[in-house]
Regions:
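Transmembrane alpha-helical segments of integral membrane proteins
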Residues: 153-167
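Alpha-helical transmembrane segments that form the membrane-embedded catalytic/substrate-binding core
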Residues: 184-192
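Juxtamembrane boundary at the C-terminal end of a transmembrane helix
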Residues: 192-205
């Protein structure tokens, strides 16, 4: 015989869960809405990049990896900051310390290494599938410069979001990753455009 109390128990458990974890839902929802908005803006920027994509064939192979890499690197950076804030290793202030310096250095090293790796893979895929593409030199310059530019922008933004959310009683683990992913999407494409202009300037000499 079916126990008629089960639906009531489920509803009670769900309402209790939502009541006890309301802050998680609120923080996560706000962060995801910002992430969705950032992705929409990034899509608009990409739609305006057709001129550059025609001028630099093969660049479209590089872009998805560059966007994903930025979110992964700084999402991890934000997670490490959150952990260090929770256990008291660092304070939510823009003050350099050994732990913060190590995290910043690791982010720069990862960005440089993965940008170089991404450029080589993008060129390799273009050759493998017989796509028309720019030279490996151009791939490397665009990828590495875009990585450095994004790094300079994303580091203070990541620290600001982590520190501010922690100061205001929000759990950085709930808000930083989606928001950082949105900013990564948003700034990677303009960084690539700036890198293209720098490359065009270099090619004049």
């Amino acid at each position: 015989m079916m126990d008629k109390s089960h639906p009531k128990m489920i509803r009670t458990s769900l309402s209790t869960f939502l009541k006890n974890h309301n802050f998680i839902v609120k923080e996560g929802l706000i962060a995801l809405l910002i992430c969705a908005l950032g992705d929409l803006v990034a899509g608009i920027i990409l739609g305006k990049m057709t001129f550059f994509l025609k001028m630099f064939p093969g660049l479209l192979v590089l872009i998805p990896g560059a966007i994903g890499m930025r979110g992964n690197i700084f999402g991890s950076f934000a997670s490490r900051l959150s952990t260090n804030l929770h256990i008291g290793i660092i304070s939510p202030k823009f003050e350099l310390s050994d732990d913060l310096n190590h995290n910043i250095f690791a982010s720069f090293v990862l960005t440089l290494f993965l940008s170089l790796f991404l450029a080589i893979v993008a060129k390799g895929l273009c050759l493998l599938f017989n796509f028309e593409s720019i030279s490996i030199f151009d791939f490397v310059i665009i990828s590495v410069l875009a990585g450095i530019i994004s790094n300079i922008i994303m580091l203070p933004i990541t620290m600001f979001i982590s520190f501010k959310s922690f100061k205001h009683g929000w759990d950085p683990d709930n808000v930083t990753t989606p928001i950082i992913a949105a900013f990564g999407d948003l700034f990677t494409l303009p960084a690539i455009i700036i890198s293209i202009y720098i490359l065009r300037f270099i090619n004049k000499f």
